[in-house]
Design a protein with these regions (language model features):
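A short coil-to-beta-strand element that immediately follows conserved catalytic motifs
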Residues: 2-15
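Catalytic core of non-heme Fe(II) oxygenases with the double-stranded beta-helix
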Residues: 18-133, 138-154
Length: 154
């Protein structure tokens, strides 16, 4: 496992995530470049919403991607950056997918990205994907989403 430590510096088995608003575009690659990262799991504990996984990959540290100056200056666990726009090209993002699933994201923040999977949350399912894949929540949260995530390394 390769999960963040607790506030008491103990190993954790993963993270419970309760979201009332969509989680924006990011990657969960960690911060230790000596590790060989592997997979991330998502266990839905509610049935509301989707997670959008992109084909695009990022090999830097855990990063939240944005073009919003306020978001770029925000402090948090992840680094903040707009460098993805220089990596994946300027191809316009699919307007229908944006409208149906990603209304919380500025469509210009999604330039050059290509969807691999739109995973509909279902109790009892387990989503497993590479930690280098960019991903985010859909904007389809009725009240809240609750899930459990883990990260692995080799």
């Amino acid at each position: 496992m390769d999960n963040p430590e607790t506030k008491e510096n103990l190993k954790s088995l993963g993270l419970f995530q309760e979201s009332y608003m969509p989680v924006t575009l990011h990657v969960d690659t960690g911060f230790d470049f000596e590790k060989v990262i592997f997979k991330q799991t998502l266990l839905p504990l509610s049935e509301s919403g989707e997670t959008v996984i992109f084909k695009n990959r990022f090999y830097g540290c855990s990063t939240t991607f944005s073009i919003d100056p306020k978001e770029l200056s925000a402090k948090g666990y992840n680094k903040r950056s707009s460098e993805h726009l220089n990596i994946y090209g300027q191809k316009s993002f699919d307007k229908k997918i944006h409208q149906k699933f990603l209304g919380h994201e500025n469509i210009d923040n999604l330039k050059g990205l290509e969807v691999s999977l739109i995973y509909k949350w279902k109790l009892g399912d387990l989503l497993i994907f590479d930690r280098t894949n960019l991903h985010c929540s859909s904007s389809n949260i009725k009240i809240k989403k609750l899930g459990f995530t883990t990260s692995t390394k080799i």
